[in-house]
């Protein structure tokens, strides 16, 4: 269970870092939002899912 928690936290940190870089780039590009809207929404959905997963796993471990 601890390994799953650690992997979920690592995935959350990695996803946060990727979104931190990619979202401003998408908004700054001239046609970026219309072309990459689905990618941004998918990344955001993954991030929200990971936040809840880390919270649930944290409550099970402690």
Swiss-Prot record:
Keyword set, alphabetical order: Chloroplast, Membrane, Photosynthesis, Photosystem II, Plastid, Reaction center, Thylakoid, Transmembrane, Transmembrane helix
Parts of the chain that traverse the membrane: 8-28, 41-61
Entry's localization field: Plastid, Chloroplast thylakoid membrane
Domain of life of the organism encoding this protein: Eukaryota
Major subcellular site: plastid
One BP annotation, GO: photosynthesis
InterPro entries: PSII_PsbZ, PSII_PsbZ_sf
GO cellular component, one term: photosystem II reaction center
Record's bilayer topology term: Multi-pass membrane protein
SUPFAM superfamilies, alphabetized: PsbZ-like
Entry-linked PANTHER family: PHOTOSYSTEM II REACTION CENTER PROTEIN Z
Function description: May control the interaction of photosystem II (PSII) cores with the light-harvesting antenna, regulates electron flow through the 2 photosystem reaction centers. PSII is a light-driven water plastoquinone oxidoreductase, using light energy to abstract electrons from H(2)O, generating a proton gradient subsequently used for ATP formation.
Assigned protein family: Belongs to the PsbZ family.
Subunit structure: PSII is composed of 1 copy each of membrane proteins PsbA, PsbB, PsbC, PsbD, PsbE, PsbF, PsbH, PsbI, PsbJ, PsbK, PsbL, PsbM, PsbT, PsbY, PsbZ, Psb30/Ycf12, at least 3 peripheral proteins of the oxygen-evolving complex and a large number of cofactors. It forms dimeric complexes.
HAMAP family named among the record's database cross-references: PSII_PsbZ
Protein name listed in UniProt: Photosystem II reaction center protein Z
Naturally occurring in which organism (per UniProt): Morus indica
Gene that encodes it: psbZ
């Amino acid at each position: 269970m601890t390994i799953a928690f650690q992997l979920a936290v690592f995935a959350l940190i990695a996803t946060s870092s990727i979104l931190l870089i990619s979202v401003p780039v998408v908004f700054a590009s001239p046609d970026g939002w219309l072309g990459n809207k689905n990618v941004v929404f998918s990344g955001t959905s993954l991030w929200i899912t990971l936040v809840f997963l880390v919270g649930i796993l944290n409550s099970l471990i402690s």
